From Swiss-Prot:
Keywords: Ribonucleoprotein, Ribosomal protein
GO BP: any one term: translation
Biased composition (Low complexity): 139-177
Keyword field contains Ribosomal protein: yes
GN (gene name): rplQ
Protein name in UniProt: Large ribosomal subunit protein bL17
Single GO MF annotation: structural constituent of ribosome
């Protein structure tokens, strides 16, 4: 259910605020970033993010809901064909507000609001996880034949152990001789 926004309206009346937000959103989707006053940017952020969420869904009903607010069909086309699919794997946080220096004429606080074009940390972590898994897949495939060979190696292992025991016994036998040589030298 639509509820009126609290506080003073941007531009004076509610109809002017609706038109103002629609025009700001149109400019944002057309250019990717806009410079405006900080209160306008803060009011635009949830408005634009809801429109992007509609664009992610992509249904005809969602397109008509967006067309109620944004009258430029070219911008709506860009929103649904480029911006919406770009944010398909992102849950919110489509815009960023960066404070900039105040406006020179009236010292109004200014901000830049822009669409976030970088990949998310989680998507990069997912990519790293997939790369790691793909590297493990060949290792696992190589380990599977080795696992099949290991039982044969275990059966063949007692035969080599017997010759290895002989050199150990030979190494153990000269030690008393070495001790005997050492004691005779004293």
């Amino acid at each position: 259910m639509p509820k009126p926004t609290k506080g003073p309206r941007l531009g004076g009346s509610s109809s002017h605020q609706k038109a103002l937000l629609a025009n700001l959103a149109t400019s944002l989707f057309e250019h990717g970033r806009i410079k405006t006053t900080e209160p306008k940017a803060r009011a635009l952020r949830p408005y634009a993010e809801k429109l992007i969420t509609h664009a992610k869904k992509g249904a005809l009903h969602n397109r008509r809901e967006v067309l109620k607010k944004i009258r430029d069909k070219d911008v709506v086309h860009v929103l649904f064909e480029e911006i919406g699919p770009f944010f398909a794997d992102r849950n919110g946080g489509y815009t960023r507000i960066i404070k900039v220096e105040p406006r020179k004429g009236d010292n109004a606080p200014m901000a830049v609001i822009e669409l976030v074009r970088e990949k998310t940390v989680t998507s990069e972590a997912d990519r790293a996880r997939r790369v790691k898994a793909s590297k493990k897949a060949p290792e696992a495939a190589a380990a599977a034949p080795q696992a099949a060979v290991e039982p044969e190696a275990v059966e063949a292992a007692p035969a080599p152990d017997a010759p290895e025991a002989a050199p150990e016994a030979e190494a153990a036998a000269p030690q008393p001789a070495d001790e005997a040589e050492g004691s005779s030298e004293d």
